[in-house]
């Protein structure tokens, strides 16, 4: 199911779902939970400078939300003048109040309420990630959101959005990032800087897909290693992955040597024909001379 194969929850490309986002946005306007904002980039820049000078939090909220209480006539005048605008959520939160939510991996987390009037629809009619993801998750019947723990700080805003839209919020499972040793330091694996973050890295090196899956299974649940050592004849799908066995502090360290060892072990259990087929498919794309050689002497 997806943009190629289709399915009952399509369309699957966000640019094709604008009518859905606009319908929800209009609903929020109709119940007084969204409003047009005509602040220019200069206005927002001056706002940030004022907040920095006053040592206030950065963002569009409270007294800094200049367009929050514009009258109908003021809004109409801006629109008649052709002024650019974005649509913002009218937050009902209080940053000085705390709330708790249950994360499936980290347990109970306490956070301040959201009070930022975030952008729902940009001036070009396209929604930012947060609003699109709330709409998509609801209409695609998503029950559990699994994502990087850097999104924990966004939970107050996302939960307020779900509630404002009249949607039931999904459950959350925030995963620790995969880390990499970089000299004397350890940092988060980056899809921009690190080739290991791309699928092509493993494909080009001839590491079988199943071996990569096995390796990441060892990172996903702390007890997978022990289970697999005793069940090497079984498929990793036979293992019952659970949220409570996922890493809750520090994050896992990417270990290429362990991945290579798992790959060797996996290949050693394949038949001669399976090894040849894997090698044939890989060399067709990455080493044509070698491919010609192995096909010339197939009997060996």
Set out the residue ranges of the language-model regions.
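Charged, often glycine-rich, active-site loop that binds/positions anionic groups
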Residues: 2, 17, 52
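Hydrophobic (often cysteine-bearing) scaffold residues that line and stabilize catalytic clefts
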Residues: 17, 21, 154, 208
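Catalytic adenosine-cofactor/nucleotide-binding cores of aminoacyl-tRNA synthetases and other
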Residues: 165-300
């Amino acid at each position: 199911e997806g943009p190629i194969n289709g399915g009952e929850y399509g369309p699957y490309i966000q640019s094709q779902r604008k009518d859905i986002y606009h319908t929800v946005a209009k609903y929020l306007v109709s119940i007084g939970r969204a409003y047009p904002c005509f602040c220019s980039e200069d206005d927002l820049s001056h706002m940030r400078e004022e907040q920095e000078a006053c040592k206030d939090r950065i963002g569009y909220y409270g007294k800094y939300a200049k367009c929050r209480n514009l009258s109908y006539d003021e809004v109409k005048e801006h629109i008649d003048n052709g002024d650019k605008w974005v649509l913002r959520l009218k937050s009902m939160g209080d940053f000085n109040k705390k709330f708790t939510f249950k994360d499936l991996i980290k347990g109970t987390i306490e956070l301040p309420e959201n009070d930022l009037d975030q952008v729902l629809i940009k001036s070009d009619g396209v929604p930012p990630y947060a609003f699109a993801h709330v709409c998509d998750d609801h209409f695609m019947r998503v029950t559990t959101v699994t994502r990087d723990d850097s999104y924990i700080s966004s939970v107050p805003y996302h939960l307020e959005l779900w509630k404002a839209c009249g949607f039931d919020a999904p459950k959350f499972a925030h995963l620790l990032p995969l880390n990499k040793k970089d000299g004397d330091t350890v940092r988060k694996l980056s899809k921009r800087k690190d080739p290991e973050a791309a699928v092509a890295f493993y494909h080009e090196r001839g590491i079988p897909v199943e071996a990569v899956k096995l390796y990441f299974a060892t990172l996903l649940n702390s007890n997978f290693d022990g289970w697999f050592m005793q069940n090497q004849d079984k498929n990793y799908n036979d293992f019952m992955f659970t949220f409570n066995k996922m890493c809750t502090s520090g994050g896992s360290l990417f270990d290429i040597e362990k991945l290579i060892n798992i790959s060797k072990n996996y290949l050693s259990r394949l038949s001669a024909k399976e090894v040849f087929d894997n090698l044939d498919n890989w060399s067709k794309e990455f080493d044509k001379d070698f491919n010609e050689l192995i096909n010339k002497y197939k009997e060996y």
